[in-house]
């Protein structure tokens, strides 16, 4: 008798081979050629099982991909996995994919090259089992998640609005699901003054604004406004004609996002020092993702499917944002952390726990089957 769990376990070496191929491609968010190469590898793999790829081309960033089976009609489940990493050109040459016992290493191995393997093989497993559930999914493989999904946000939200739920394949820290995430945004403030020995200081104007911006931080509410980068001036003995700052914002709720956004724009709408001029750009790029009753019901289904195969799944709130922030904002229940288990994302020590590949592939396949049978 054919066994789903057994078949998936037998595919572990194939999954690792795909992961090695993907890891050994430099695909930092701004490396378009590398990301598109990753996209070509994945679209080729999906084509082998009759999934069609719709390419959303971009000039500077990698092309986003929308993938579904050629016989799919109004699929209800959205799967999202990003193809970019935080690592620059040449990283792979210095530390390519490697394996040591139950662990695999390499740039982006857990965040999130391994998730592409578990996703592909979950769909293959459903096909092998005779299920039709693989026709009920649509995948967005985006290319800029690590820099805020600014270019892919419109596509994600557009597709999400046609779905009943979203499953985000970010890696699972300690095996936990993610049910909530902070929102965030980035702003850039430029200040123009006048250069002279007795001119109008752009740096002084910026300094006054920084104090007001930092005063927006409210730790009890989970609001953090931080000016993390500043620059300005031309020499130590002249008044600075120009200064600029980069501002990072983290918020707990949608409402706080609106409040902080308005406050930042108000602070930067006028000059403290006569003769200076301010330019502000940016916004809340990721709305906060808060747990809803619909998402709790989705968690219940996922945890039940995990328990059937010995996985005790907990869910937690995470500080960093992901594409689940966008799908939740679009109005559909969303759960994150469905990828394989690993840790140290964005670090040289990043790793994948190899035994989790089969476990998370089986979990994803069973969840898709369960959601498709309702």
Language-model-derived ranges and their functions:
Residues 1-105, 128, 324:
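Acidic/His- and Gly-rich active-site-bordering loop/insert found
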Residues 74-138, 147, 353-354, 358-359:
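Active-site metal-coordination/substrate-binding segment of hydrolases
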Residues 210-218, 290-335:
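Active-site-adjacent substrate-binding region
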Residues 7, 11, 18-25, 41-49, ...:
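Generic non-transmembrane alpha-helical segments
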Residues 145, 150-294, 300-304:
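Midchain, well-structured core segments that form catalytic/ion-binding scaffolds
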Residues 1-13, 49-51, 83, 184, ...:
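Secretory-pathway/membrane protein signature
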Residues 83-85, 103, 140-147, 169-173, ...:
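Acidic, glycine-rich active-site loops and adjacent beta-strand->loop/helix elements
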């Amino acid at each position: 008798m054919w066994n789903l769990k057994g078949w998936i376990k037998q595919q572990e070496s194939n999954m690792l081979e795909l992961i090695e191929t993907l890891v050994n491609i430099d695909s930092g968010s701004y490396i378009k050629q590398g990301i598109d190469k990753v996209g070509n590898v994945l679209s080729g793999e999906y084509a082998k099982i009759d999934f069609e790829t719709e390419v959303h081309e971009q000039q500077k960033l990698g092309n986003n991909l929308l993938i579904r089976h050629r016989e799919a009609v109004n699929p209800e489940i959205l799967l999202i996995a990003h193809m970019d990493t935080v690592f620059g050109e040449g990283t792979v040459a210095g530390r390519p994919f490697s394996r040591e016992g139950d662990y695999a290493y390499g740039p982006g191995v857990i965040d999130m090259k391994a998730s592409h393997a578990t996703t592909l093989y979950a769909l293959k497993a459903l096909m092998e089992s005779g299920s039709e559930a693989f026709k009920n999914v649509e995948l967005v493989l985006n290319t800029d998640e690590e820099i805020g999904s600014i270019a892919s946000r419109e596509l994600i939200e557009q597709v999400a609005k046609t779905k009943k739920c979203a499953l985000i394949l970010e890696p699972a820290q300690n095996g936990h699901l993610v049910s909530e995430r902070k929102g965030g945004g980035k702003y850039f403030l430029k200040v123009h003054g006048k250069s002279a020995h007795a001119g109008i200081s752009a740096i002084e104007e910026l300094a006054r604004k920084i104090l007001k911006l930092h005063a927006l931080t409210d730790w009890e509410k989970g609001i953090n406004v931080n000016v993390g980068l500043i620059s300005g001036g031309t020499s130590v003995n002249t008044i600075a004609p120009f200064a600029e700052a980069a501002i990072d914002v983290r918020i707990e709720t949608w409402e706080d996002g609106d409040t902080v956004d308005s406050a930042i724009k108000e602070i930067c709408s006028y000059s403290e020092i006569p003769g200076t001029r301010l330019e502000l750009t940016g916004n809340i790029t990721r709305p906060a993702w808060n747990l809803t009753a619909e998402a709790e019901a989705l968690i219940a289904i996922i945890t039940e499917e995990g328990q059937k195969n010995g996985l005790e799944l907990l869910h937690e709130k995470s500080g960093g944002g992901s594409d689940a922030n966008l799908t939740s904002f679009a109005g559909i229940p969303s759960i994150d952390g469905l990828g394989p288990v690993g840790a140290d994302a964005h670090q040289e020590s990043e790793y994948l726990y190899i035994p989790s590949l089969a476990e998370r592939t089986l979990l994803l396949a069973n969840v898709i089957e369960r959601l498709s049978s309702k």
